[in-house]
């Protein structure tokens, strides 16, 4: 597990011991950031269920301006990885359950260009987080919410403001869905 490119290219990331964290593979991360492309530089990033911090740190390495990492149990690992990658200055690390943190943000002023949501699979957490981002209006216009979930977790909750614009499956193991605000899609001329 490493940072693929940017200012911290090649930096190895430390993972917590045990199987409670399932980091996004380098292959999936490379594919994801290839799709995101020009959205990353100068972006404000929220990395939910951050684990090692790999997604947010990759975004910082590629030029994102600031990243908030939220995880109840791995804040120390994230801090260590951010320090090792020399990206700590632009990182804010929150030791809190991601769903509770989203509840705290809802209705507030804070919004993000890019939100990563990569919770443990098969626990219903991605659906809860998706609905909270949707109802809490946490995504800036033109921003993207990226959700990684189990490949067999197909059912989408009802959404008001967000629409799935892309889905990529990685076998039966995992899938990534990308969401944008419906109003931003209409303004851009997308269906």
Language-model features and meaning:
Residues 1-191:
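Class I S-adenosyl-L-methionine-dependent methyltransferase catalytic core
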């Amino acid at each position: 597990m490493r940072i693929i490119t940017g200012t911290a290219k090649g930096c190895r990331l430390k993972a917590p011991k045990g199987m409670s964290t399932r980091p996004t593979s380098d292959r999936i991360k490379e594919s994801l950031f290839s799709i995101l492309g020009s959205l990353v530089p100068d972006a404000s990033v929220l990395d939910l269920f951050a684990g090692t911090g790999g997604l947010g740190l990759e975004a910082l390495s590629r030029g994102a301006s600031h990243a908030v990492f939220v995880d109840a149990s791995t804040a120390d690992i994230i801090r260590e990885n951010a320090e090792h990658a020399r990206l700590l200055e632009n990182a804010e690390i929150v030791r809190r359950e991601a769903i509770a943190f989203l509840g705290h943000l809802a209705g507030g002023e804070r919004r993000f260009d890019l939100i990563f949501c990569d919770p443990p699979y098969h626990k219903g957490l991605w659906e809860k987080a998706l609905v909270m981002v949707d109802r809490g209006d946490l995504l800036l216009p033109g921003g993207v919410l990226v959700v990684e979930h189990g490949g067999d977790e197909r059912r989408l909750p009802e959404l008001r403001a967000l629409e799935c614009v892309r889905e990529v499956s990685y076998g039966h193991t995992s899938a990534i869905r990308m969401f944008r605000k419906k109003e931003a899609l209409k303004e851009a001329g997308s269906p």
